[in-house]
Amino acid sequence: MRRKLLIFGLMVLFIGAIIAIGIRSVDSQNDMVARGKYLVDAVAACGYCHTPRAGAEYNMKMYLAGHPADHPYPRYNFNMMQQNIFLLTSPLLSAFSGPFGTSFASNLTPDKETGLGEWTEKMFIDSMRTRHHQGNMDNRKIFPPMGTLTKHYAQMNDADLKAIWAYLKSIKPVKNEVSPVLNRLGRPF
């Protein structure tokens, strides 16, 4: 009888430990997502470009979904350089045009077809570190203004970039096919 009680007691402790570890793991993931939200919204201010405006406010239905595919974008004219104009932006602040070409804020939501849904954490972190699309050095560089900002994001530690990734994977996917980056002649790279 004593032996059965001992075995039962050990089983209860073992199961309790497994549950506690599982809860701690969920809490740890929730903490990481919360940290990522803080970094995305308050520190890196990703929504400033990646969330289109609806008037003076952000269009939260398009939170981090990038430049709307059906929205017009600015077109840079090289004569503007003589007027010291080097960057044009759309009214939504999600498309940018300059001597480099035209770039569009990407869809950062986890949508599998139009966002980061097929990316891996490694691709995301490598992209921030290398300033190349999908973190692949054979891919094109990330264009301004994001290409300029990623040199700052590259200084973030791995824990912060992983937290940002965890948060981006946790938000609602939004289907929004962002236009490809255009070269100076208005053609996709």
Predicted features by range, described:
Residues 51-103, 133-189:
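Flexible coil segments in periplasmic/lumen-exposed cytochrome c-class electron-transfer proteins
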Residues 36, 43-53, 124, 164, ...:
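The canonical Cys-X-X-Cys-His
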Residues 109-116, 149-154:
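Second-shell loop/turn segments in exported
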Residues 40, 48, 107-109, 145, ...:
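Structural recognition of the beta-strand scaffold that forms the well-ordered cores
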Residues 13-22:
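Hydrophobic alpha-helical membrane-insertion segments, chiefly the h-region
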Residues 126-134:
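Glycine-rich, acidic and aromatic/proline-enriched surface loops and short helix-turn segments
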Residues 23-41, 54-56:
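Electrostatic cytochrome c docking/interface patches
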Residues 1-12:
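N-terminal Sec-pathway targeting helices
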